[in-house]
């Protein structure tokens, strides 16, 4: 199903040769209007410009060839239809489908195979139950606290703040994730428990951080003499320890085939987004994601937004050798989006083993980082322009702000100034500027792309979420790795459990290295 191995692809050989002399973005006339128009794509409310990437037509044709040799569209089709994509052949692995797309497939008319259709059907049933629940909960409660970790917090939190500016709401929303009790304490200080709905999210029902934070909140409710069962909601797998209606006001379900970092369109995101903005806004969010799911099956790379972005990322990572990628949204609403992308990209593709269980000899996920513009122009952009490492940048922007507040100063609005800065940074990174004073010299040739929509709405938020989900999936398919497990998370958790045993005096085995470290910090005597 994967075609040739990544390093065996003929297209890769051609790309390696092109990478020796990539297009010079600093050359006079390089960024002509013709190039800018030609190297752009408009789809599902977005316009994507990649004229400032170091690619030309020959390079793009070779990247298209690589997508065909690796059968990337076929792999995407298989994933959406419920094939076993989360696997390592010949070794113990999760061996399950990857069906986050099915959680929103029911909002459009899609022909799905059996397992995908079942998840879509169950997702619709859960959404309808959610609508009934929200009718009562939104009338009764003014505040919601979501307790979760990883994908149970990062994606929903990013999407909540993305939608907050365009969806009027009188609801207060808080997120508690860190096992550090100060995280829970600062939220407890801000809320009226009687007016608060607590949503606990854990697929297994046993995850350490949500369990500890749930206990802190349960103790707070007990101390106030309030009914826990009337204020707590669970989002978990069927049959998990949390799947217990006697302990919760309501229990919503998710499935093993939906990974945490891809779960924002399931009830993991549905309860908090629906409570905050209403059921209709949540459906609009799902519709945006579902539209990109369908679009991601477009065969031609230059007409397929997530595939094109994925392959430009492969070019920058594997052919030009850039180790990091910065994602810079010029929108306050996306202030937590890069943190979500760090998990979605690096937990998915930070792998060194192929799907055949073999060590790989090429680079996979870049380090993903970033912050909101224009703020970050006054922090790390100095390094992007004149540092020793070239960092590809993915700019995200909007032509109109969310809240409508603006002013005109010196002949332009704040929204215009914001967008002008986005464009200026992309051009400055690409073209650079020569100067006789070396301290004022900008080398240029730093690649970037620009993704723009009219305004950050619930539908656009859903589309943006799905765009990056599919971008990372396509890259994993190209590299031949399993983008859908996270074994790297487990070792530290196992050792932490042993160390907790030592600290509590109940260690089942000796762990001298840990004892030594604990004694150093006076945790053990």
Swiss-Prot record:
Database matches in SUPFAM superfamilies: SIS domain
Domain of life: Bacteria
GO biological process terms, semicolon-separated: gluconeogenesis; glucose 6-phosphate metabolic process; glycolytic process
Keyword set, alphabetical order: Cytoplasm, Gluconeogenesis, Glycolysis, Isomerase
Metabolic or biological pathway: Carbohydrate biosynthesis; gluconeogenesis; Carbohydrate degradation; glycolysis; D-glyceraldehyde 3-phosphate and glycerone phosphate from D-glucose: step 2/4
Reaction equation(s) it catalyzes: alpha-D-glucose 6-phosphate = beta-D-fructose 6-phosphate
Protein name as annotated: Glucose-6-phosphate isomerase
Native organism taxonomy: Bacteria, Pseudomonadati, Chlamydiota, Chlamydiia, Chlamydiales
Name of encoding gene: pgi
